């Protein structure tokens, strides 16, 4: 199995508090290949409709239980070869962020954890407007 975690830099997360770290750690423990990508690394391959690719880095746990990767090992993959993509980055809700959700929307095969369409349509700062009784 192969999981991709689209997230903020994994080497900068707090391993005692971050739920994404816990997902990755458990996935690695179970023998699942885990990869990291930055949203800006996702692209559509020219002249190939629906070929959405990304540059990725393989994630490992070092001896201190921190996530590590080697930037020189950046490789390109077809995102439909992943079993699941976890969209976990903190949103700067800007055009790059929106464009990334549209590209990920085009994928047919992998399980998308945090649906890009719903992320785009219901930004966390606005979702509370749907529940005024809770504010």
Predicted regions and their residues:
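Extreme N-terminal starter segment of soluble prokaryotic enzymes
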Residues: 1-4
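TRNA-binding/sensing appendages of the translation machinery
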Residues: 6-8
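Conserved N-proximal alpha/beta basic substrate-recognition cap immediately N-terminal to
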Residues: 11-135
């Amino acid at each position: 199995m192969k999981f991709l975690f689209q997230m903020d830099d994994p080497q900068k997360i707090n391993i005692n508090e971050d739920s994404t770290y816990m997902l990755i750690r458990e996935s690695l423990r179970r023998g699942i290949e885990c990869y990291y990508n930055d949203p800006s690394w996702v692209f559509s391959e020219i002249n190939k409709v629906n070929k959405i690719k990304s540059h990725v880095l393989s994630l490992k746990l070092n001896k201190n239980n921190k996530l590590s990767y080697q930037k020189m090992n950046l490789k390109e993959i077809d995102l439909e070869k992943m079993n699941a993509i976890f969209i976990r980055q903190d949103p700067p809700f800007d055009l790059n962020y929106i464009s990334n959700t549209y590209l990920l929307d085009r994928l047919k095969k992998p399980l998308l954890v945090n649906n890009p369409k719903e992320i785009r349509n219901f930004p966390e700062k606005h979702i509370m407007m749907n529940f005024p009784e809770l504010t």
